[in-house]
């Protein structure tokens, strides 16, 4: 028989349970199985390619084991640019600054693979956005974008993913939209894609003109979304419908 103290502790724990849900929690068992089993995960090809690319390009400066935890703290402030940069942009900056190579373009397969490898090193770790005060105005910009109505349908991110999360839109479940698994493999895409690709899809869905890849708006929005998901575990490479 449970003691009153133990029962009270259970009630307190339930009251403080994290209401946030990963998109993984809402997927079918078959799609969850694809993500759980690395040998079945369709993003494996990109992950392996990223590992090879890291070995050939990055080990002169970085050891693979040092990548553990890196993805948990992006976007981060770049002192030279005086603005936040995403993990993908940091990789591209390393490419141009130190390898003196041409920057990869949006959704480049090699770039996605390398970012997947770096982010995968932090799989299972909680997102830990930096407390750097220089990020505060950019994060606030992202919050404002999240609640701003856009497009001909006059919808905001918050309307779908805060107010109506768990409901359905055109037959599809509306997720809470926590960016815990990017780059992700979407079955709809039959390929790997970045968070910005997904955000552009959402904007097109409400009939708004999508921001450009790499835009300040997308970086600010990602900064806010990562703060919103702080403490949730990284899943990269996640699989979604």
Question: Where are the language model's segments positioned?
Answer:
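N-terminal, post-signal-peptide region of Sec/Tat-exported proteins
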Residues: 38-65
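Short Cys/His-rich "knuckle" micro-motifs
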Residues: 68-71, 167-170
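Post-cleavage N-terminal segment of exported redox proteins
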Residues: 2-5, 12-46, 75-140, 166, ...
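C-terminal cap of thioredoxin/glutaredoxin-like
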Residues: 151, 159-165, 177-187, 193, ...
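The canonical Cys-X-X-Cys-His
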Residues: 55-65, 114, 142, 152-164, ...
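Short, flexible, mixed-charge glycine/proline-rich loop motifs
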Residues: 50-52, 147-151
